[in-house]
Amino acid sequence: MKNKGRGFTLVELLAVIVILAIILVIAVPKITDTIKNSKKASFESSAKTIAAQAEKKKMEKEILEDTGSISCSDIVKLNDTDYGNCSITFDGNTAKVSLVGKGKFEGLSVINGTKDNATAGEVKMPEYGKGTTYIKALYDSDILRVTNGLKKDNTSDANIRYEGANPNNYVSFNDELWRIIGVFGDNIKLVRTEELGKLSWDSSDSSVNDGYGVNEWSQADLKEYLNTMYYGGTSVTCYGGRNNSTTTCPTGSLNSTAKSMINNYTWNTGAINSSDTTIVIQETFTVNTVAFYNAERGSVTGKICTSGSDCNDTVTRTTTWPGYVALPYATDWAYASSETACATNINDGYDVANNNFDNMTCKKNNWMHHGSTRYEAMWMLSPYARSGVANVVWNVLGVGSVNSFRASLALSVFPSVYLNTEVKITSGSGSSSDPYILK
């Protein structure tokens, strides 16, 4: 009787397995390459679409005489799961998009892609760890430097800074969003994203400097509020006008976790002398950025006058101050703009002939800029040195110029801190929806 349905022999089974293995060896890489190329093409298409829409947006804004910057979020709602850092610059009317992928696009990036040409390359993110080391690693990558909005300034210190309309410099700090100004030596410098409130930099009795305050940070009323109350938790009197006019203190405070990360830093509080023509040219309102930066760290104090009702305080002047919380410098604001002119002239764009501030350059593509009018100003740290007065401080106006006001005026306060050298970045991409987490 014959066997029906004879099974496979061991040799035949082994042969089948070998054949299947060969098929897999040949087919799987091709399938993988197909999937990879499809993802790459899709990612490149996204960059081209953003560039095309950015150019349309630019035309619309020009018709409306709107000189504001254009960011990726103005163009399209990107899926945070699959898209990370995104930035837009313009070469004339040509939009250039830099885009980093994550999720299904992990490891892909486009640098300066246009609507007609966007080539995706592969990029590897640095390992999380010490914050300064992580940011320096981002800067050292040609791709990540661009997509994260990093640069080195043109000062002798060559500080790494974040620039542009919306770079990836958000951090979760004090259970709220702050932003990284840059890396200064071994410290990361932060500034609060939202204003804390409007306060005088300093005020005084009517018999002292005509009631307009004293432009010496080590004794300033705002210094007392930021370090004794906002940081220290002990109530102080807050001021909002001339002649020691009081106001309600802001309710914000720093929690214990945030305070543990803040360095007791020696801040430079040098004054900028408005009559120094290497810094300020009064006839053209030109302000030399590097010279201004050096003066912020210089030896001039806010009192170069010797007499007068605006110059009769007896306060000892200093050019450094050790403490926890202060304010940004005017040059921090200038270098936050990606406009190249701001590296040499903080007040570029001023129309001297018509005394017009409508087209100020450094407010453009500047993540740190606040406001749009002359009356929406933010206090800076440095005193303003001028003959005849000892009560004037530098600030940045909403119209986009550095300026000076009496210290007693109530302007917007954006606290700034330096982090301890060992603070780590443990996760996040630096976007507002996925800020860096510090530890």
Positions of the model-derived regions?
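N-terminal single-pass transmembrane signal-anchor helix
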Residues: 4-32
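Long, domain-scale functional regions
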Residues: 64-66, 71-92, 103-107, 111, ...
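Sec-dependent signal peptide cleavage junction
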Residues: 27-43, 431, 435-439
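Membrane-proximal N-terminal amphipathic helix
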Residues: 38-64
